[in-house]
């Protein structure tokens, strides 16, 4: 029986591992353990998240809680090493590009386990970004590089570090979750009509720390979107910063509907039925492409190029002229045509399990 350990480092990782767990459960040849790097009382892991995703809660919480990326790395390595003493794994699956992800990857390789990286090959090509360092380290160590698209697949293949590692373009596992839950989405109690609101999400620390740029973004949204409500489900620092900025603006911000996060299935409904999405999140941009909803990304880059080249996403960075132009197109219904990238078919988890068991 193949023993598989799945490591989640933050809330978004659970959205991607839930289909993996279903696929493993459907196999008679593998068992899994789900490990979370953080604390059991982590406020971002509301009970409704696991209920909405129809997945079990983690088997173990490593209990790491720090704002220092280096401290997180050290603490996760030590705690995960102790965990593997009692629960040896044949394969360790890590997700995305967090410090905790890198720490688990290093520990797994030192313990002699096979390492699989889910969403491998994503690059910003900015080595000053901590996540870019994490990606390079994880991919270099991985035995199985599971990529989501053509561009990331070519990057992972080109950078492959050893003959024993293999790259597989398995597709975008986020689509497995979206397709599975599409019929289960719930409309939030916000008095909204389909296609008659905008969705705003903000999370990137650099953007939130630049108060002048954030003020310009909020002002531009108010000035160019008429009477359309703007729903903004935010967490922690993003919530505090945006609420403060809105109260200090010289114009009315009453059109903003700011909420302290929102359950997963309700957020899925908001993404699927918005007139448009404004975000700094690659995952949210992917959801918008899946739903054929116009999306503006407030970054100069995206690790998910297919959302731009094939999908509904455009990049504006911090250029207010580009933001105004994109919002005008969004409001006027003049958005570009989009399609689904290759292998966004909802079968990614199935492919991964087949590869791991072959």
Cite the ranges covered by each PLM segment.
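A donor-sugar binding/catalytic signature common to diverse glycosyltransferases
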Residues: 94-95, 106, 117-118, 145, ...
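A nucleotide-sugar donor-handling region in carbohydrate enzymes
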Residues: 39-44, 63, 141-212, 316
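Active-site and donor-binding regions of nucleotide-sugar-utilizing enzymes
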Residues: 5-8, 14-23, 49, 61-162
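Leloir-type glycosyltransferase catalytic cores
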Residues: 151, 314-358
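A generic structural motif
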Residues: 27-33, 113, 226-230
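N-terminal beta-loop-helix "entrance" segment that forms/cooperates
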Residues: 40-56
């Amino acid at each position: 029986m193949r023993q598989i350990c799945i490591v989640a480092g933050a809330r978004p990782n659970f959205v991607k591992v839930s289909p993996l767990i279903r696929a493993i459960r459907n196999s008679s040849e593998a068992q899994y353990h789900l490990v979370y790097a953080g604390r059991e009382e982590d406020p971002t892991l509301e009970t409704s998240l696991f209920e909405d995703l129809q997945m079990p809660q983690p088997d173990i919480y490593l209990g790491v809680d720090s704002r220092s990326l280096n401290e997180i790395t050290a603490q996760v390595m030590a705690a995960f090493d102790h965990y593997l003493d009692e629960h040896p794994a044949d394969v360790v699956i890590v997700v995305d590009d967090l410090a905790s992800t890198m720490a688990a990857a290093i520990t797994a390789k030192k313990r002699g386990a096979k390492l699989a990286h889910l969403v491998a090959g994503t690059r910003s090509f900015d080595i000053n970004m901590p996540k870019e360092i994490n990606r390079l380290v994880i991919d270099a160590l991985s035995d199985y590089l599971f990529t989501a698209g053509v561009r990331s697949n070519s990057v992972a293949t080109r950078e492959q570090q050893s003959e024993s590692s293999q790259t597989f373009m398995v597709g975008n596992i986020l689509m497995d979750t979206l397709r599975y839950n599409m019929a289960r989405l719930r409309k939030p109690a916000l008095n909204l009509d389909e296609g008659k609101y905008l969705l705003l999400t903000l999370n990137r620390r650099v953007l939130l720390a630049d108060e002048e740029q954030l003020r310009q973004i909020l002002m531009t949204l108010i000035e160019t979107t008429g009477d359309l409500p703007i729903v903004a489900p935010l967490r922690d620092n993003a919530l505090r910063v945006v609420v403060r900025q809105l109260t200090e603006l010289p114009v009315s911000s009453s059109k903003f509907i700011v909420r302290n996060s929102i359950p997963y299935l309700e957020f899925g409904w908001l993404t699927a039925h918005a007139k448009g999405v404004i975000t700094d999140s690659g995952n949210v941009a992917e959801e918008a492409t899946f739903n054929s909803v116009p999306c503006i990304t407030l970054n100069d880059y995206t690790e998910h190029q297919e959302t731009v080249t094939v999908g509904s996403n455009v990049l504006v960075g911090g250029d207010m002229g580009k933001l105004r132009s994109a919002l005008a197109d969004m409001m006027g219904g003049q958005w570009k045509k989009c399609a689904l990238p290759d292998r966004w078919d909802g079968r990614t988890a199935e492919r991964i399990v087949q590869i791991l068991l072959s």
